[in-house]
């Protein structure tokens, strides 16, 4: 079994809407989407992202910056837009996506909102963005993957689009490493017709995935909604993902996909092949985010759950329970090394791991009556960390505790 390798991306928060086919409201009818336990059909539009407005950020009731160095930054969006995912290639190339098909870009000075990606479909929520480089941008949008060769401005940025194979499926998380891209999908199994929850490819080419492989689906065979909530690569040949809740249980399943040689689980005489194995998360709570490096793979989720897998524990297949300082749901995680990992979640929760203990950072919303949910965290460096949430983007430029 291969060792845990360095991860090249953050986990990506995935937040889906109700299973009934909802009619899409106009883009002016913005309400924060209810981002709780997923119960979804892959082909459901935003429906105006209707939900509980209490979770939206109220900057008027918040401080510009907290004592910890977290600051609210100006972003050209309605405060009811949920920023669901953040990724970038560097300090001057940061992307964020969210509800109402919102796409944002930061060039090192200001955030700009892109024109809506031209696509003949209802305005789905942008579930995930992954940036492999300045000229390699991937976005999950309902049942569709969009790809751009880089930011050229709000109106001039060029996109190509592709719908992946399968019926009632939707990409929910994207990750990549060293030329390899892996996509986690929500699937809807009908009458024992099982779709692939994991798709891997060698990049983007001529309007679609280059050399796509749809991985065997042994672990995702619940009739109805199943598949992956988050996914993160730990090397070009390895990724970890967390599952959706199903009628059979909560979203507490964890799988590892890796390219195995014939002597390590692959088919004899067939050369290396992708294998998918399930691991014990030691929780029955929903798991919303995953991140890892050569030292550990981290999981975060419902009720402040934090789990860790180290190379020493990999043969056992069992994750370690790590004490959490909060009971709020944690929805995103990203890190830079063994002593510098970030996690974010409900009630404006921002946590940091210093190699020994998780601690909560002061937030600009600590004194606010309504505290936003935070969904995604990504950084170009330890002193350049971005966080997206309910109507807000936070930036950290200091030194974490």
In which residue ranges do the predicted regions lie?
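Residue-level hotspots at or immediately adjacent to binding/recognition sites across diverse folds
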Residues: 26-29, 36, 43-45, 52-401
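C-terminal motif of bacterial Sec signal peptides marking the signal peptidase cleavage site
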Residues: 20-23
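Bacterial N-terminal signal peptides that target proteins for export
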Residues: 1-14
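Generic hydrophobic alpha-helical membrane-segment signal
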Residues: 7, 38-40
């Amino acid at each position: 079994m291969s060792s845990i390798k360095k991860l090249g991306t953050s986990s990506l928060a995935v937040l889906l809407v109700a299973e009934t086919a909802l009619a899409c409201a106009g883009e002016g009818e913005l309400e924060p989407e209810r981002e709780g336990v997923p119960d979804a059909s892959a082909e459901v539009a935003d429906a105006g992202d209707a939900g509980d407005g209490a979770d939206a950020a109220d900057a008027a009731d918040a401080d510009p910056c907290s004592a910890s160095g977290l600051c609210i930054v100006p972003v050209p969006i309605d405060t009811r837009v949920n920023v669901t995912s953040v990724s970038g290639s560097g300090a001057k190339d940061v992307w964020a996506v969210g509800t109402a098909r919102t796409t944002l870009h930061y060039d090192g000075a200001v955030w700009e909102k892109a024109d809506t990606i031209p696509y003949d479909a209802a305005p789905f929520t942008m579930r995930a963005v992954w940036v492999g480089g300045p000229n390699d941008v991937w976005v999950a949008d309902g049942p569709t993957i969009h790809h751009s060769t880089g930011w050229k401005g709000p109106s001039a940025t060029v996109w190509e689009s592709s719908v992946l194979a399968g019926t009632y499926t939707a990409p929910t998380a994207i990750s990549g490493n060293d030329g390899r891209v892996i996509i986690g999908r929500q699937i809807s199994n009908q009458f024992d017709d099982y779709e692939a929850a994991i798709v891997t490819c060698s990049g983007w080419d001529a309007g679609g995935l280059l050399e796509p492989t749809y991985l065997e689906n042994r672990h995702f065979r619940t009739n109805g909604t199943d598949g992956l909530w988050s996914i993160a690569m730990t090397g070009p040949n390895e990724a970890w993902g967390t599952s959706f809740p199903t009628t059979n249980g909560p979203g507490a399943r964890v799988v590892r996909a890796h390219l195995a040689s014939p002597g390590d689980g692959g088919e004899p005489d067939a050369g290396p092949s992708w294998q998918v194995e399930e691991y014990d998360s030691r929780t029955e709570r929903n798991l919303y985010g995953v991140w890892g490096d050569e030292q550990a793979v981290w999981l975060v989720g419902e009720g402040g759950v934090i789990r860790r897998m180290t190379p020493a524990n990999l043969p056992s297949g069992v994750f370690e329970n790590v004490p959490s300082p909060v009971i709020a749901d944690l929805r995103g995680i990203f890190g830079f090394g063994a002593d510098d990992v970030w996690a974010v979640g409900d009630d404006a929760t921002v946590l940091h791991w210093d190699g020994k203990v998780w601690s909560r950072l002061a937030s600009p919303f600590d004194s606010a009556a309504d505290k936003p949910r935070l969904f995604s965290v990504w950084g170009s460096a330890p002193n350049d960390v971005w966080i997206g949430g309910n109507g807000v983007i936070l930036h950290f430029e200091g030194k974490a505790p």
